Structures are given as structure tokens and as C-alpha cells.
């Protein structure tokens, strides 16, 4: 990294780094899908360095870099086939191209004085942000992020970040060698993700991140164009004909004279959230303003990414009549009616008042679908035994089921209704009993009668344990707190049931 910083920043010569051994070590240490140099074909740690050295020597020779991944003969190269060779090169190339982006990000954070906070990485921090801001908004744009129609669009997006033409040509080589790229990225995004997870996982995430970065530049334009003048009093009036000529002067004057009456502001009521190939743009603006933003995105995609997007990719919804389904929660803004009784002298009157309140619940069907996919129940939600765990010890089986429920309960603690978690607890509890009964060749009834309530000890939620330790003498307070929505700032990923 220090060697790269000493290079001429106007050129960013990255291609020579592919011939440096330490780059392969960096790719190995920071690879998203683990080691590809050490965990292939039985090579150990010592011989992997020899593979890298021989690989670099062969690349110096003419015509050894041009090898086809789709060659049906799969000619061996250094004891490996060409798929392994291309995978190593793509991982290293993506690592090299990430260097200028990382340096630019670090310098930007240092220049702005942004303090690193691990709590901001928590998924629950998104919901606490929505809870504080979405109740004041009116409309929301639900956007499906379009996929690039051609691989050259991905390369062109990187030209603004990477100035080294040789590195971009090498990237084109890897993209062209990936068979059926166009059909993978346009027809089925899940299939594309599965393909790259097996071959070029890191390269795929790098390209997708750079593409989304260019896609989100359109939001920055909207943010800059949303500045307007707001008046809270008629005490100060500005002649419209001289408005644009007085902007610079007004910026210096309003802080001293008109601070209570006039101010410039960039639409602080426009908020943006991106997740899992989708994005949300919420605003306090009118339906006409949201429709103009929708047209802007269509024109932006068509002119910049050469995409003809169908209208269903962007929908305008009113927050009071719409629910947002993302990250395992169903969030909405509802009107909570309230009535206030007042009295003035001898007259009594009632005041009806509706308060907007952000609410989040956990839909049960996606949870049941995840449990069914992991073979804890069938499609209807009826618990079944985990046959693959029947060979484990009783304590390991109970510990695994208990850990899964504690993780799910911890993640969905922000739900205002706990019925979904009770259903999950029932499914996992009975699935655990069926698994243990299968192991001991007994029935579920006989097994539960034998062990009794001891089977439930592992299914106490982590929240209940924390509350019991925090309020050991006031059980009513702990029970009341356990029924409320709680956001944790230590959750950085969604638990995948298939990995347990």
C-alpha cells in the first residue's frame, strides 16, 4: 500500500502489481471466499508460495496469460486446471483494483473528520433511524435496482476510479471468459450470484459495488438540486426577479439578520435506504414531486446505463397506506388515534388527534419458509425432526436448537408483536423433541414425559436472561420490557439458518 501511495496519482499504474508476490498474500488474507491458493488440490502452506512464484514467471512469458476458462480439455497448469488459474488471477485483479478505491475512501473520511463507529454498522441502526424519521414523511419510492445490460457498462463505470488502461483490459478479459455472462446478469440475478460464488466471488462483489456506486450518483444529484428557499414568516420578502442574483449575498446576511425567518436547506426530509438489490427513497414532498423523481430515474438509467426499465421497477406509495418489507421486518407508518378531553371554565370539549407512529412487525410466513428450507418443518409449518443431527450428542442437539432460537429472537426483538416468535419457538422446540426421539428410537410423547421441562431450559431468549440479571427483584418490569421493541447495535448480519 505504501509503494502504491508513492506512485503518480494521475496515472494509477496498477497492472505491474500483478507481478508482485505480496499482492497474492493480500488477496489470500482478505478474500471473501477464503483461500483459493491454499485449499485447492491438496497444496499446503509451503508449496502455495512456490505456486505463486511459478505463476508469476509464466506470466512474464509470452502467450501464457491468454488461457481460456471454457477450454473443454482443461489442460493442467502448475498442477491445476485453467479454471483454478483464472480464479486466482481474478481474485488478485479485484484486490489490486480495490486499492485506489480504498485509499480514496480513507482520505475522504479523514478529510471530513468522520469518526469510525461500529454501532453504525448494525442492521438495527437502520430501523432506529426509520423510527425517528419516517413518521414525518408522506411518500416513498420503492426501487428495484436494475442490472447492467452489458459487461462493458461495468468496465466504463470503473474508468472514473481506475485510470490504468491495462488493468481495465485485463478486467475485460476475465468478464469475456465467464461464459453466458449476459444471460446470467440480466435474466436471473440469483443464478448470477450463485455462479460467481463458485468462481469469482470477490470480483463479482467488487463490480457490483462499483456499479451501485455509479447508480447512487443519481441520488446525489437529486440531493444537490433539492435546495430551495423556505419562509416561515411574511416579515421578509425577496423580489423574485433578483432572487438568483442575491443568493450569494443572502447566504452571508441571513445568519445575522433573517435567521428566524429565512434559511436555505437541502431537503432534510429526503431519506435513502438500500438493501438486497432494492432501495427506498422517502420524502415529505408531494405526489407530483415524487413522480418527477421517478421520471428522472428512468431517464438517468436510459442515458447513463442504456437500460430500458419497465414501470414496475419504481412504484410511488403513500406511507400511511403502505408497508415496507425488508431485512426480515414489515415496517409501516400508521395513524394512532387519540382523544383529549379539555375543560375551559364550565365548558367541556373533546379533541380528536391522530399521531403518526412507526411500527415494525415480523411476518410469520417468511420465517416459516426459512425453517422449512432448513428442514425444521414442512411448508405448512408442521415441525419435523432434523435427521442429519441425530448422530450428535443430546447436549449438542439441544444447544444447536437453542442457539438458533436465541439468534432469531435477538434479531427480531424490534417487533411490536411477539406472536411470530412464539410460533418459531414452538416449531424449534418440537423439532428438537422429534430429533431426540428419533435418536433414542422413541416417541415424542414418551421422550417429553421422560425429560419434562428440562428440554425448555435452552430456549430462554437472551433478552429474558439480560432482563433477569438487570432487574432481579422486579420481575414485572422485566416482563414489561421484554414485550417492547428493542433495537440492538451489535447485529451486523442476518443469521442464515442453513449455516447452523
Swiss-Prot record:
Q: What is its main location?
A: plastid
Q: Name one GO cellular component term.
A: chloroplast
Instruction: List the GO biological process terms.
Output: mRNA processing; RNA splicing; tRNA processing
List locations, semicolon-separated. Plastid, Chloroplast
InterPro entries, A to Z: Domain_X, Maturase_MatK, Maturase_MatK_N
Q: Which Pfam families match?
A: Intron_maturas2 (PF01348), MatK_N (PF01824)
Reply yes or no: does the keyword tRNA processing apply.
Answer: yes
The alphabetized UniProt keywords are: Chloroplast, mRNA processing, Plastid, RNA-binding, tRNA processing
Q: Name one GO molecular function term.
A: RNA binding
Q: What does this protein do?
A: Usually encoded in the trnK tRNA gene intron. Probably assists in splicing its own and other chloroplast group II introns.
The family classification in the record reads:
Belongs to the intron maturase 2 family. MatK subfamily.
| Protein name (Swiss-Prot/TrEMBL) | Maturase K
Query: In the UniProt record, what gene is named as encoding this protein?
Result: matK
